[in-house]
Amino acid sequence: MPGQKIETGHQDVVHDVAMDYYGKRLATASSDNTIKIIGVSNSGSQHLATLTGHQGPVWQVAWAHPKFGSLLASCSYDGKVVIWKEGNQNEWTQAHVFDDHKASVNSISWAPHELGLCLACGSSDGNISVFMARADGGWDKSRIDQAHPIGVTSVSWAPSTAPGALVGSGLLDPVQKLASGGCDNTVKVWKFDNGTWRLDCFPALSMHTDWVRDVAWAPNLGLPKSTIASASQDGKVIIWTAVKEGDQWDGKVLKDFGAPVWRVSWSLTGNILAVADGKNNVTLWKEAVDGEWQQVTTVEP
């Protein structure tokens, strides 16, 4: 589909855009404290709803898997995480508000749907919280205290199947792992084990020289290794790989972009990485047969 310009209707900076599972709706997050839901199609776009309730800039939005219904999560500078639920078409209500954090919540990530309805949240208070929906409508909470003591900037779930596992074999318990990035310039990997979160990388992954702005764990369908991309204020994107459970993570610089790198995002197949940098460029990268990363295209704005 050709590129099309979408007027969001926001009164301030747009920080995040998320497409729903079916590619029919966009959710946008803005410094005007609101979220907009926009219907998109080949013929254009239309404003469907404005979600109000946050008392500060909204940093990120994330759609839940549709098997849980029409749900959207948002996080804000106001320290709150809101789960929005669509009842009648385009009528959204706050189904749940989490106010456990004492500072800005900078990042949210839904777990793979195989793990249930489960949301991880990273905050400037240094903590990561994980909320798991129960059958009775309540939520269980677990927490990683002081994951990055001077602030968590990003969280991303691992795929629920271990690398190289036979998809659908049903023999393996789903994997519960998280990657996080922080203001301490590090990337950390966490594993949920016997009811608690434990650090799963020793030492922390520390090749960046400034804040880590984003982390993204790659889908690994049929791929033999685990891969995490990290983007930093230092201008670098680093690709971290671990061949099997318990292995050390190996880091390789994808590129020094010469400007802060804000976001990294994997294709659904896990073999193409999109990078958004501070020079307003979006570039796509693919790993060649020899293990080197090559730019495949630039996305024109």
Can you say where each PLM-predicted feature lies in the sequence?
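Terminal intrinsically disordered, low-complexity extensions flanking WD-repeat/beta-propeller proteins
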Residues: 163, 213, 223-226, 236-238, ...
